């Protein structure tokens, strides 16, 4: 899942080298923390949150196969 988020996020941002992705695994839940550069947060979120919502939808579809729940958090540095 971490790789999927990383690929999607790097395609959206101007500074892919400053992008950090962290995965925190629980028993049924997987939390993925995404830390973009300050100037790239708007690009990750997108207009009216469309980009981040699309990323969450894809993650939930992939997680359903694994019978897990995924939470994508965008963290402002």
Q: Could you describe each region identified by the protein language model?
A:
Residues 1-43, 51-77:
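RNA-contacting regions in translation and RNA-metabolism proteins
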């Amino acid at each position: 899942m971490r790789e999927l988020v990383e690929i999607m996020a790097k395609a959206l941002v101007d500074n892919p080298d400053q992008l950090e992705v962290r995965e925190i695994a629980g028993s049924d839940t997987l939390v993925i923390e995404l830390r973009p550069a300050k100037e790239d947060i708007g690009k990750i979120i997108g207009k009216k949150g469309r980009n981040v919502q699309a990323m969450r939808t894809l993650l939930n579809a992939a997680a359903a196969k694994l019978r897990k729940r995924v939470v994508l958090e965008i963290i402002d540095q």
